[in-house]
Amino acid sequence: MRSRAPRSSRAGEQHGVRPENIVWIFGTGRSGSTWLGSMMEALDGYAMWNEPLVGYLFGNFYYFRVGDRKLGRHSILGEHYKETWLGPMRDLVLGGAAARFPEVTGGGYLVIKEPNGSIGSPLLMEALPESRMIFLIRDPRDVVASSMDARSEGSWLSGRREDQRRRSKPDRNPNAYARMRANSYVQQIEKTRQAYEAHGGRKVMVRYEDLRADTLNTMRRIYSALEIPVEEAGLARSVEKHSWENIPEKEKGEGKKRRKAKPGGWKEDLTPEQVEIVERITAPLINEFYPETASTRGAL
């Protein structure tokens, strides 16, 4: 049974982006969400909102900053006063979408790529229960390896959030960075799982590894599960256009945003100590989603 949408203060929702035509991509960063979103965006009648971080805005505040205060009467996002703020949250997303993507108002599809806002996915799916959800997951060891490369000195993300004159976090203390990123992975995936399990609408869970191994059939499965009609020839063209093999060589490789696209590449990238750190922290999720790798890990 699908949940009822919270009351919205915005009149004429039907003239904006239809809530049921929003497709969220949640999970964690460095999981292939840009690739997946780009394949969907390339289809006629689609647009992609690239990481609005609305999930981070509300989720980080609600789950971590407020803590137990949300159970009382004074926190603005109080648990017992959800009816007062879920509607405005809904308005924020729909209003922001309509202002930015008028080309899909009235009938098009909007893919919202929000891996780094996945901490707030339970709240967003509660605010927009008509919307569709993709739970995208990738082996945590590959996620950590990719993240370490992205934030290493001289790499594509290294200078965005810190002084470029300082050595990046993965370079200064790679083991500490691996630990931090593994813990972040657990938080993001657990919240995404919570949202996925609670969502009564259309949804699908996808492993990056399956998307990489058989892209076209996995995309077909996604559209079937989400109950979105898709033109076969257009889907095939989009998959081909965005395939790893068709990315120019100068745009991929170590230190680039598109790095390996190689499941299991962590075996070449992480030290044994880093592997042990990541596996210890993420063991329950590895056992659940990647049981076929048990022989490489031993008993966890």
Where are these regions (language model features)?
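Generic structural marker for isolated residues within well-ordered, non-membrane alpha-helices
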Residues: 37, 94, 98, 121, ...
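PAPS-dependent sulfotransferases, especially Golgi type II membrane carbohydrate sulfotransferases
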Residues: 1-23, 148-151, 157, 174-181, ...
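Residue-level signal for short amphipathic helical patches enriched in basic/charged
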Residues: 31, 43, 128, 214, ...
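PAPS-dependent sulfotransferase catalytic domain
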Residues: 62-63, 108-233, 244-255
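A short, structured active-site edge motif that brings together acidic residues
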Residues: 51-55, 137-140, 235, 239
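Alpha-helix-centered segments that form part of catalytic cores
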Residues: 85-110, 178-188
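Short, well-ordered beta-strand elements within core beta-sheets of diverse protein domains
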Residues: 24-26, 206-211, 266-268
